[in-house]
């Protein structure tokens, strides 16, 4: 079971008011709801994956090592934004749940927020993992995922302020190599962001994907669209149908 945080401590000392709200759209309520959905979709199995939301000067983050379908608002970490990515000891946590660990995804989420994102999602989708393996086999380790002439591509932005992609556009998602520790992915993620400035996602080989958006709804729907495209790509590959027409 998820490690429950007892609320008998002094609420003022840990800024618990930051995660207490009756508003269903509050980040502390949205993150548990999102994680339950992602668990049911097979995206965050076995405590893997995570989600984070930026609201003004605060960043709300799901904890590490917790069964994602059981997360509650009082399990959420809160960071002051902006905050240093490294070292971890310099990060400006203004709320830390007792007995829980900060997410290892934190510096990667921060990389997305530093580029203007309002929400960042990390999944361990099997379809995302499979396409990274197929790309490596077909294009080598430097290849990116590409697909065109599929209607669902319209659910992905062309880039900041550039509208949405069209049916005939070719979607490109960069792929970075996995590392033994999640935090060590940060440099490669930022490099991919620089090389593909219009991307809203980065695949991690044999691991999963990071997807971000201007707000929660956009990050979620983009993640859904990408997962649909990855699954379709795997099935197309089985049938010998090329991804780019």
From Swiss-Prot:
Source organism superkingdom: Eukaryota
GO function terms (MF aspect): methylthioribulose 1-phosphate dehydratase activity; zinc ion binding
Top-level EC class: lyase
Major subcellular location class: cytoplasm
Keywords of the record: Amino-acid biosynthesis, Cytoplasm, Lyase, Metal-binding, Methionine biosynthesis, Zinc
Binding-site list for Zn(2+): 122, 124, 207
Enzyme Commission designation: 4.2.1.109
Subcellular locations according to the entry: Cytoplasm
GO annotation, biological process: L-methionine salvage from methylthioadenosine
This protein's pathway: Amino-acid biosynthesis; L-methionine biosynthesis via salvage pathway; L-methionine from S-methyl-5-thio-alpha-D-ribose 1-phosphate: step 2/6
Co-factor binding comment: Binds 1 zinc ion per subunit.
SUPFAM superfamilies per record: AraD/HMP-PK domain-like
Region (Disordered): 1-23
InterPro entries: Aldolase_II/adducin_N, Aldolase_II/adducin_N_sf, MethylthioRu-1-P_deHdtase_MtnB, Salvage_MtnB_euk
Amino-acid positions noted as binding substrate in the UniProt annotation, renumbered to this chain: 105
GO cellular component, one term: cytoplasm
Catalytic activity: 5-(methylsulfanyl)-D-ribulose 1-phosphate = 5-methylsulfanyl-2,3-dioxopentyl phosphate + H2O
CC cofactor: Zn(2+)
Active-site residue numbers: 151 (proton donor/acceptor)
Family indicated by similarity: Belongs to the aldolase class II family. MtnB subfamily.
PANTHER family named in the record: METHYLTHIORIBULOSE-1-PHOSPHATE DEHYDRATASE (PTHR10640:SF7)
Role summary: Catalyzes the dehydration of methylthioribulose-1-phosphate (MTRu-1-P) into 2,3-diketo-5-methylthiopentyl-1-phosphate (DK-MTP-1-P).
Official protein name in the record: Methylthioribulose-1-phosphate dehydratase
Origin species: Aspergillus clavatus (strain ATCC 1007 / CBS 513.65 / DSM 816 / NCTC 3887 / NRRL 1 / QM 1276 / 107)
Gene: mde1
């Amino acid at each position: 079971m998820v490690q429950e945080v007892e609320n008998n401590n002094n609420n003022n000392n840990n800024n618990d008011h930051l995660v207490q709200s009756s508003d269903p759209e509050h980040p502390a309520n949205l993150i548990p709801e999102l994680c339950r959905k992602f668990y049911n979709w097979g995206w965050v199995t076995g405590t893997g994956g995570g989600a984070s939301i930026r609201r003004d000067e605060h960043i709300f983050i799901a904890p590490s090592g917790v069964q994602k379908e059981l997360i509650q608002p009082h399990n959420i970490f809160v960071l002051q934004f902006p905050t240093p990515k490294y070292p971890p000891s310099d990060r400006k946590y203004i709320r830390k749940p007792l007995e829980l660990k900060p997410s290892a995804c934190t510096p990667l989420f921060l990389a997305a927020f530093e580029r203007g994102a309002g929400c960042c999602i990390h999944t361990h989708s099997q379809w995302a993992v499979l396409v990274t393996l197929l790309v490596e086999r077909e294009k080598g380790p430097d290849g990116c995922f590409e697909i065109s002439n599929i209607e669902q591509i319209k659910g992905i932005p062309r880039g900041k302020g550039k509208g949405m992609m069209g049916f005939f556009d070719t979607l490109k998602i960069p792929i970075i190599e996995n590392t033994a520790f999640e935090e060590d992915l940060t440099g490669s993620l930022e490099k991919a962001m620089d090389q593909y400035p219009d991307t809203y996602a980065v695949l991690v080989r044999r691991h999963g994907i990071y997807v971000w958006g201007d707000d929660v709804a956009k990050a979620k729907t983009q993640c859904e669209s990408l997962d649909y495209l990855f699954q379709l790509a795997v099935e197309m590959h089985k049938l010998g149908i090329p991804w780019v027409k």
